[in-house]
Amino acid sequence: GKNSPYRVLAIPEKFTLYDFAYVITDSFDFDFDHAFGFYNHLTRYTQATEAYERFYDDPSTRYVCNPFTKGVEKTLVNTGFTEIGKQMLFYYDYGDRWNFRVELLRIEPAEPGKKYPECVQSVKKARQQYPDEDWDEDE
């Protein structure tokens, strides 16, 4: 929604969707330890007609994918995000069901000497990935 936290991220064009998924989760301080996918249906991934899933890259889980599904490990970001304004649902953790709306805002040449990926803008504090867990990392 309009009041949701969001991030503007600058990523290199050679990044795969897998790399991009890591950058998204990292920008929200999430662990990168769950299955995920990118879908062209923004509210219901099950109704998508274009999908890129982590499940596809693993031969033991590929059978759960739709015939049109592609993987994320070898698919470049510009394969999924083909034009300015293209939006996709980044669905992370099928158990906890985190929904991120991802949009290609612009394509710009890399600035010489700048390190990418970069979080260009961070609006609002991210929600906690595991809000109910009461554990100490030192234990």
Please name every model-derived segment.
Residues 1-139:
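Short linear regulatory motifs enriched in tryptophan with gly/pro/ser
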